[in-house]
Amino acid sequence: MFCVQCEQTIRTPVGNGCSYAQGMCGKTAETSDLQDLLVAVLQGLSAWALTARELGIVDHEIDSFAPRAFFSTLTNVNFDSDRIVGYAKEAILLRQSLAIRCRLIDSTITVDHPLAELQLDSDDIPTLQQQAQQFTLNNDKAEVGDDIHGLRMLCLYGLKGAAAYMEHAYVLGQFDEQIYAQYHAYMAWLGTQPRDVDTLLNNAMGIGKMNFNVMAILDRGETQAYGDPQPTSVNVRPVAGKAILISGHDLKDLQMLLEQTQGTGINIYTHGEMLPAHGYPELKRYSHLVGNYGSGWQNQQIEFAKFPGPILMTSNCIIDPNVGNYGDRIWTRSIVGWPGVNHLEGEDFTPVIEQALGMAGFPYNELEHLITVGFGRQTLLNAADTVIDLVATKKLRHVFLVGGCDGSRTERSYFTDFARSVPQDCIIMTLACGKYRFNKLDFGTLEGLPRLLDVGQCNDAYSAIMLAVKLSEKLGCTVNDLPLSLVLSWFEQKAIVILLTLLSLGVKNIYTGPTAPGFLTDNLMAILYEKFGMRPITTVEQDMKAILGH
């Protein structure tokens, strides 16, 4: 086992990465190794998809399957070894079928790629785990060096984050053949074990640019299906009644659950990255979408244990449900998996609903506590002139984007303290689950504008980018000349690709924390600082002084 993809990876003086019987996330060595094998199979599949395109063959099933299967290897998504193997088997069947179609056009066709003909050695998991040792991500690290290895991981993990957003978009009926072609090109290239520093850096930026287009179609899918988010008050305290909790990012799953629970007397609560759903007109019209429950994903073992109903996980992040003894009432969907828990294959939530009806639910209404969400792309763009006027009249000094992933590391209190320290003549935009560090605090208003603007999920960084672009156009300057600073927390691969997207667009002077990614060496961090001014957080006082000048 070797895995260094998330922020909580083991760090030692001799190297970083989880490499023992179990990762810090709870992923076993078996599952980790099988995920490496799956990635190798998917890289071979992408090599064939590229060759097929040269022959005029575009296989939409492969285009949708490949990023979905890759998504299953993201941090805190799928811990079920059998299902990981199932994805690998399906990938090989799809590859073989595509090869037959290619050879009907050109019987001599071959694919010059080391993984193009990769087969599984067995159906037996121990044998497959042994085979997977060939594809452990640090196999040639001693040969190529830490910097090359780190750049490979930057590209691989960035592409993994983009694959997740591609799947979210596809679920909403949004896809783009050019994006799929780019995805396959990067995936196949990574399977060749690239060693050139400049190519690795350039392709990392290319993955970031590709992801900007992915976020654009995802934004389109969400707003076409559910309307543009509107500022909306959300109760974060329970109300009396039977309950289902839904977590993850998949708004379509939430919509289907709301439809299927209408008239049942069951209240639906969002958790984690589902919070922004309350701002979408076509979702908030359901009266039994009553509020948001809990905080950051890392607290779920305590919070889920106290929730008096079933829990539906639609994407990341899931952690061991046995710790809180709620494994019998957590349900997984799509690419999510945990061994021994209930998995829903289709779109019928009847088993979840029946379980909720058989449970007590919340016994009484707690005192209401409202927070505001729904400052999506259109709302932000509509406010652009107001922001410009406030800046021009010196009533608004600076805008901070403080957000990203949450996690359990104690150093993450920095982001709470930073938000608290933002001066009264400044506003804060936030997004992703990092907002839970401070989104229940009262920041008041500035000239009628809320000082805390919840932009949405992690992919809604697109909304913040579009606001920055519009402001820069109106003011006749670059994005980097705006009174805007980004202070981002990271945990997993979606955050990595959003960072690559920002860097690829030329956004500079980003502060990141709580720690640098374990795969980025000091040399690589120095390169990112030199090229983009990207820097690790230090102390709130020091960073605030550096940003505001005093």
Curated annotation (Swiss-Prot):
It is found in: Cytoplasm. It catalyses: A + NH4(+) + H2O = hydroxylamine + AH2 + H(+). One of its GO terms (molecular function) is hydroxylamine reductase activity. It comes from the Bacteria. It holds the Pfam family Prismane. Its cofactor is [2Fe-2S] cluster; hybrid [4Fe-2O-2S] cluster. [2Fe-2S] cluster binds at C3, C6, C18, C25. Keywords: 2Fe-2S, Cytoplasm, Iron, Iron-sulfur, Metal-binding, Oxidoreductase. The keyword Lipid metabolism does not apply. Its main location: cytoplasm. Its EC number is 1.7.99.1. InterPro entries: HCP/CODH (IPR004137), Hydroxylam_reduct (IPR010048), Prismane-like_a/b-sand (IPR016099), Prismane-like_sf (IPR011254), Prismane_a-bundle (IPR016100). The keyword tRNA processing does not apply. GO terms for cellular component: cytoplasm. Gene3D superfamilies: 1.20.1270.20, 3.40.50.2030. Binds 1 [2Fe-2S] cluster. Belongs to the HCP family. HAMAP family: Hydroxylam_reduct. PANTHER family: HYDROXYLAMINE REDUCTASE (PTHR30109:SF0). Catalyzes the reduction of hydroxylamine to form NH(3) and H(2)O. This is Hydroxylamine reductase. The lineage of its organism: Bacteria, Pseudomonadati, Pseudomonadota, Gammaproteobacteria, Enterobacterales.
